[in-house]
A protein has these predicted regions:
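S-adenosyl-L-methionine
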Residues: 1-130, 134, 175-179, 258-283
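Conserved acidic-Pro-Pro-aromatic motif
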Residues: 40, 83, 104-111, 118, ...
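Glycine-rich adenosyl-binding loop in Rossmann-like folds that engage adenosine-containing cofactors
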Residues: 46-75, 132-133, 138, 143-192, ...
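Amphipathic coiled-coil/heptad-repeat helices and related helical stalk/stem segments
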Residues: 69-73, 93, 186, 216, ...
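Active-site glycine-centered loops adjacent to acidic/histidine catalytic or metal-binding residues
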Residues: 90, 141, 208
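Hydrophobic packing residues within well-ordered alpha-helices of enzyme cores
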Residues: 100, 122, 135, 150-152, ...
Length: 283
């Protein structure tokens, strides 16, 4: 059935290309949007219908598992105070951005996602849930350097994809990272954004970028001392011990203590069995 569905879609797509050459472009765009409506999915969360754009099986899976893949992240977001500022660094398609915006009143969210594969879906999810007043998408990478054009390596060019690397030659485990999918893009440091008053200091920060969490923290050494920051959730690979030590040293220096360490063992097996979400609380 899936082969039949794909074949039909390809035939329709070819028909659209031919029609586009001989017809009005606006008609084609409207028809294309009509076809894509089948990719919109609603899920009952927080006793509300929340909408998601799910153009493939991976994004559909991410939406299906939003509440049970990382329950510690959901619990952490539930603890946020109203009228707070949340930085979602490594937002992917925006699951936790959308959840936080729906859960908390008057929250302001800066959603960081440099992957061109994910930005299309992230922006749609914000738009279809009418969260433009609460959510601000930052479409570039963060690192320890200011204003650099560096290579972003994508594990796969697909919506909902992860395990990417910005400006480094290693992956989430510290091993050499070889991929064919890459392009140069802009990145800067957190301190640069704060010092230039481009963004506001957050109360809560989530960092899940699959490999350069330590570099992002190095680029935030001034901001991390700010008492406005209440807690930081960082995805850490315990098996990437050099990186883990750097992260703990930075957090301790800025008066953070480990509040919790959790993961759902069902989803983190084999290559991912060293990965945990650490929540650091300001002392």
């Amino acid at each position: 059935f899936k082969f039949f569905q794909t074949t039909c879609f390809n035939i329709v797509y070819l028909f659209l290309i031919i029609l586009q050459k001989i017809s009005n472009r606006s008609i084609i765009l409207r028809f294309k949007e009509f076809l894509e409506k089948k990719n919109y999915f609603d899920k009952n969360i927080l006793n509300k219908k929340i909408y998601f754009f799910t153009p493939n099986e991976l994004t559909k899976w991410r939406v299906d598992t939003i509440l049970d893949k990382e329950p510690e992240t959901i619990k952490w977001i539930n603890s946020f105070k109203n009228n707070s500022i949340f930085w979602d660094i490594g937002a992917n398609i925006g699951l936790y951005t959308i959840y936080a915006a729906k859960k908390k009143k008057k929250i302001k969210i800066y959603s960081f996602e440099p992957s061109t594969s994910n930005l299309r879906t992230l922006s749609r999810n914000v738009s279809i849930n009418k969260l433009q007043k609460n959510v601000f998408i930052i479409p570039f990478a963060l690192s320890n350097s200011k204003n650099k054009l560096l290579q972003l390596k994508e594990k796969q060019f697909t919506e909902g994809g992860a395990l990417n690397a910005f400006g480094v030659k290693y992956d989430y485990s510290g091993k050499n990272f070889f991929v064919e999918n890459s392009y140069n893009t802009f990145g800067t440091s957190i301190d640069d954004l704060i010092e230039k008053r481009i963004l506001e200091t957050p109360n809560y920060i989530k960092i899940d970028v699959d490999g350069i969490e330590d570099l992002i923290l190095i680029g935030a050494k001034n901001m991390l001392s700010n008492k406005k920051i209440k807690s930081v959730l960082i995805e850490i690979n315990d098996k990437f011990s050099i990186q883990k030590k750097k992260i703990f040293k930075i957090m301790k220096k800025n008066n953070f203590k480990v509040l919790s360490k959790n993961r759902n063992d069902f989803y983190y097996k084999n290559d991912f069995d060293g990965i945990y979400n650490y929540i650091f609380q300001k002392i």
